[in-house]
Amino acid sequence: MKKFLKYLAVFLVVLLIAAIAFLFRPIASKKIQTSANEPVVDVVLVGGGIMSATLGTYLTELEPNWQIRMYERLDRVAQESSNGFNNAGTGHSGFMEMNYTEEKDGKMDISKAVKVAEQFEISKQFWAYQVKHNVLGQPSSFINPVPHHAFVWGDNVAFLEKRYAAMIKNPLFYGMQFTENANQIKQWAPLTMEGRDPAQKVAATRMEIGSDVNYGAITTQLVNNLDKHQNFKLSTSSEVTGISQNDDKTWTVAFKNLKTGKADHVKTRFVFIGAGGASVKLLQMTGLPESKQYAGFPVGGVFLMTDNPKIAAEHTAKLYGRAELGAPPMSVPHIDTRYIDGKKYVLFGPFATYSNKFLKQGSQFDLLASTNKNNVLPMTAVGMENLDLVKYLVSQVMMTDEDRFNELKKYYPNAKREDWRLNQGGQRVQVIKKEEGKPAKLQFGTEVFVSKDRSVTALMGASPGASTSPYIMLNLLEKAFPQQVKGEWNPKLHEIVRSYKQDLSDNPVLLDQVRQYTSQTLGLHYTPLTQADFAKIAASQSK
């Protein structure tokens, strides 16, 4: 026994030493050797998703002479979270997402819903501009009109009614309908009501202007257009292996062709890391002091999906429920119409899964590889402070197929098992951020990183993500290129986004003009406001 304890003690000491050595290992890239006469490009975009595609499109229009390079580790762009089958395709506008509104001291706070709705109006303007200029193709190839509904039952009916009463006063949500009438809800979303107990108390809201968006199609079309420009070059099957700063403050990005094994590098003045869940690891390569405050927590997701034509024909709606008390925002259940590559699907979920991967096609060592002496304690602290999230993830991972199907039946009572299959969605990596003097926080939104010298930027985090990518990248431009945005770029930005720097929630006339323009261009459902409508809005705002 003594011998065993001795060996155990030695083993634990060795394990502790190995753990300390691992945590204190260098995480920044070694300096990449370059020659002084190498050409320097203007921009390197790491990752071939919707963020890089959107930023590349902005920059090509603002600075057509800039040399831009894009590197994607897979053999095609838009194959991770941007891919149509890897997300729910929601054009997040705050219309139905009840986790964007919360009741505080008896008052309904709709500020987050207003913010998200404003941002999506920017997205629609950006896409409409690209359609007008033949950058994006037929609108129905990437966006389709699908009304947005919030749906509740039982005790949550009172919450939804209060939410509606608060939201209808804001011009962004004018036209929202509310009902507790089961027959009316059946007209809006037949599958949701067929087979439901008629005694059950239910309520729903509806916004006609809602949409379903294929972000993979947008990404592919934007990149295809970029590829037509002589100053742009896309390299697929190319994994970034290092990012280091040069003495002249430019950057060298090293990459390896995964098909040939050939290693190469490029020098650049500006780096954008838009690699989805992998952005945290890639940002750590830079060695920037301000990058040390970040860590990532990966969460996967699966959906139940059907392409049964009869079911798809009966459901043209995105319908969101309300998350259970104490559950994280990612747990909101919804049953959605999806249009992907010309075919109609119905999706239900998401159900959380756990994986150490930071990308769907990543490595099980991703989480471990991103852990170091700078973030191990913040990660531990966040885990201890978010036991509700841990409990939720455990309960989700333990779910059986029968459990998932029973959740579906709450939203589609007549559902049949044989019509549905599981579809693995993309990986989302929630950001853990530790600022000096403050406790570490788990963030559920998106995080824009800009280095102090503004030469390195990154996009991390999750929802609303892709749906507000034009707004997010516009925000990034403002932080990374403040002089140009205020100066020579300003007229072009106003041309691309007509409401740029204007508050639509306080300007119903401009909002109506913008929605008429984007809805006509993108083929969305919108009824222009009348003088009587403007009078109602003014009266509701004065109350």
Curated annotation (Swiss-Prot):
Pathway: Carbohydrate metabolism; tricarboxylic acid cycle; oxaloacetate from (S)-malate (quinone route): step 1/1. It comes from the Bacteria. GO terms for molecular function: 2-hydroxyglutarate dehydrogenase activity; L-malate dehydrogenase (quinone) activity. Its cofactor is FAD. It catalyses: (S)-malate + a quinone = a quinol + oxaloacetate. InterPro entries: FAD/NAD-bd_sf, MQO. It holds the Pfam family Mqo. Transmembrane segments: none annotated. Keywords: FAD, Flavoprotein, Oxidoreductase, Tricarboxylic acid cycle. It is an enzyme of class 1 (oxidoreductase). GO terms for biological process: tricarboxylic acid cycle. Its EC number is 1.1.5.4. Belongs to the MQO family. This is Probable malate:quinone oxidoreductase. The lineage of its organism: Bacteria, Pseudomonadati, Pseudomonadota, Gammaproteobacteria, Moraxellales. The gene is mqo.
